[in-house]
């Protein structure tokens, strides 16, 4: 989630250490849809040096991966370099989400030794509000159920893909996913 200051990040770091949290999923909400930064520069540095080393998984989208690594991401090779750089910051693994790129929605998982792509079709819908939060939460749920990280990521990708595919047009603008698609057939 959005941790806008280094003081807030430090509170989270201390709580994670105090309670011995081992399966921390960090969804670094850092960049608004407008492209504006949501974190002060000191918070970005604190996130990199204090919180990411505690993370089992970090789930940045392309703009967030660019902000974390300080590099522009255009190609598949850039995505791989960014993933490697984020793991080098201390995270055990990373999923660089590809929803901001053209073509199929391809996310890149990297655990420090192996890369794996998770690809899903891109749907013609505006009902994508909350996809990143939902993905990170689904990964965390998978880890809490005892799944291996890569398996939790795969199940989260499938869940979010179906939640987008089965979303309803509600109101104006970007609508929500259908988190309850399994209940409503």
In which residue ranges do the predicted regions lie?
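Short beta-strands and strand-loop turn motifs
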Residues: 25-33, 59-68, 136
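Charged C-terminal helix
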Residues: 150-185
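Short pre-catalytic strand/loop immediately N-terminal to key active-site residues, enriched for Gly-Thr
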Residues: 115-129
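Conserved phosphate/ATP/ADP-binding segment of small-molecule kinases
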Residues: 41-115
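Glycine/small-residue-rich loop that forms an oxyanion/phosphate-binding "nest" at active or ligand-binding sites
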Residues: 1-53
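Nucleotide and nucleotide-moiety/phosphate-recognizing core
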Residues: 11-13, 17-19, 23, 106, ...
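Short, small-residue alpha-helix embedded
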Residues: 67, 126-149
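Phosphate-handling active-site elements
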Residues: 115-116, 142-156
């Amino acid at each position: 989630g959005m941790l806008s200051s280094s003081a807030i990040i430090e509170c989270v770091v201390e709580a994670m250490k105090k309670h011995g949290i081992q399966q921390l999923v960090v969804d670094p909400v850092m960049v608004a849809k407008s492209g504006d930064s949501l974190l002060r520069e000191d918070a970005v540095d604190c996130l990199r040096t204090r919180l990411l080393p505690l993370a089992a998984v970090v789930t940045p989208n392309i703009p967030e991966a660019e902000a974390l690594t300080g590099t522009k991401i255009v190609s598949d090779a850039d995505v791989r370099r960014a993933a490697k750089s984020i793991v080098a910051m201390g995270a055990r693994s990373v999923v660089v989400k590809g929803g901001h790129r053209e073509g199929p929605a391809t996310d890149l998982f990297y655990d420090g030794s192996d890369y794996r792509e998770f690809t899903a079709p891109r749907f013609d819908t505006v009902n994508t509000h909350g996809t990143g939060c939902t993905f990170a939460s689904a990964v965390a749920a998978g880890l809490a159920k005892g799944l291996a990280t890569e398996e939790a990521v795969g199940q989260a990708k499938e869940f979010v893909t179906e939640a987008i595919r089965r979303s309803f047009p509600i109101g104006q603008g970007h609508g929500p996913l259908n988190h309850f698609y399994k209940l409503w057939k």
